[in-house]
Amino acid sequence: MSTNICSFKDRCVSILCCKFCKQVLSSRGMKAVLLADTEIDLFSTDIPPTNAVDFTGRCYFTKICKCKLKDIACLKCGNIVGYHVIVPCSSCLPSCNNGHFWMFHSQAVYDINRLDSTGVNILLWGNLPEIEESTDEDVLNISAEECIR
């Protein structure tokens, strides 16, 4: 997906947790909207979530666009929490987008604003280090209380 048209560096980074079981799914979440229908709010991430979600079901296409999608489910509780864009379609690819292919339904996850290294300011995408995704709570330094709030 193209990111040269729009800038997302001032967007807040979120920790995404499953609403059903409170499992941390990603430490690199961003609030987003569906390209094909901007009335639909979502969350997205740029790195495949490891040890948190897995594919479920078959690939499918929507009526709105021709992107090839596959649902993802929380590994802890099994509920579908979003989908992965396997192949973006020719109409979505050139659109203003954040380049993320991992999408989370706002009805299935909740977000917690991630703080920067000072622990005071909200971390912005422009300041986010490019590291490999991990959902290990020790690595993320997230307390259970913070994820439950």
Curated annotation (Swiss-Prot):
Highly homologous to GCUD2 but localized to a distinct locus. Disulfide bonds: none annotated. Pfam families: YPEH2ZP. Coiled coil: none annotated. It comes from Homo sapiens (Human). It comes from the Eukaryota. Belongs to the FAM72 family. GO terms for cellular component: cytosol; intracellular membrane-bounded organelle. This is Protein FAM72B.
